[in-house]
């Protein structure tokens, strides 16, 4: 039997749906860790085998630690055991509680040019609204945006340490703004915002299609609606307006694409990779 983690059956889209894990102990019941195999039928229902004691335990995705989720990710079996749409809560150091969902598996590129096993995106937005920039400009695009700096400093610092310990640096391609899509920047972030392409699978406001591909969690306008303090609200994407030197692309309160001035205040729904 291989060392690692094993979910007996896949988790559904609910944080309350249980999964089963094999815990490994010495015969004196000293906990060793969890065990995993692609062939779950080789495990006993419980009891001693090969000098160890095994116990079947119930868990939910809400009950998994970020270290356990990271182990699933690094083992290469996360896609078999978790599902797009699985939802988990995060309590920030400010005591604000946010919820994230699995947006996809093996979708994003990390800063070392490997593939991220799991991408999470917030279900809704932070309680506070933010400007993309302090003035009416999108020069430099997401790479130069004030909100990018805020997201990866002030906001990032409010995330719990166990999550920050396993959060990877994600590499995104974003246009440079200035009313043109002639220049594409490489941007490496721990926290980031999805692009118009990643949310809609099209780029009617961005004007260029090189900013990633659609996350399967977004299937229609309803799936793109996000709330600020309990009410549907507009929120930022990381896409600069392709024909406007001062605006960024947003999602409106009905889940439709739109655009607004960079110095306006709107919701922020961040993503990250494990």
Predicted segments, located by residue:
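Short, low-complexity N-terminal tether/leader segments at secretion or assembly junctions of large
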Residues: 1-20, 28, 32-35
């Amino acid at each position: 039997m291989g060392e690692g983690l094993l979910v007996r059956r896949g988790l559904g889209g609910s944080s309350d749906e249980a999964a089963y894990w094999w815990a490994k102990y010495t015969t004196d019941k000293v906990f060793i860790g969890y065990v995993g195999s692609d062939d779950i039928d080789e495990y006993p229902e419980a009891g001693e085998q090969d000098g160890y004691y095994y116990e079947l335990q119930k868990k939910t995705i809400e009950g998994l630690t970020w270290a356990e989720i990271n182990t699933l990710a690094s083992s290469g079996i996360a896609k078999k055991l978790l599902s797009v749409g699985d939802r988990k809560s995060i309590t920030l150091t400010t005591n604000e509680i946010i919820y994230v969902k699995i947006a996809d598996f093996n979708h994003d590129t990390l800063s070392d040019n490997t593939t991220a096993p799991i991408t999470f995106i917030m279900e809704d937005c932070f309680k506070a609204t933010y400007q993309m920039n302090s003035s009416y400009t999108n020069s430099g695009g997401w790479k130069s945006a004030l909100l990018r700096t805020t997201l990866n400093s002030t906001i990032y610092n409010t995330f719990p340490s166990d999550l920050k310990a396993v959060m990877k640096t994600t590499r995104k391609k974003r246009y440079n703004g200035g009313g043109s899509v002639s220049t594409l920047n490489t941007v490496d972030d721990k926290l980031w915002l999805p692009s118009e392409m990643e949310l809609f699978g099209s780029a009617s406001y961005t004007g260029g299609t090189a900013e990633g591909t659609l996350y399967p969690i977004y299937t229609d306008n309803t799936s793109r609606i996000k709330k600020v303090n309990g009410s549907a609200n507009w929120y930022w994407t990381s896409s600069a307006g392709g024909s406007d030197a001062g605006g960024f692309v947003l999602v409106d309160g009905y889940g439709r694409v739109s655009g607004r001035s960079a110095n306006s205040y709107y919701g922020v729904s961040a993503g990250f990779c494990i």
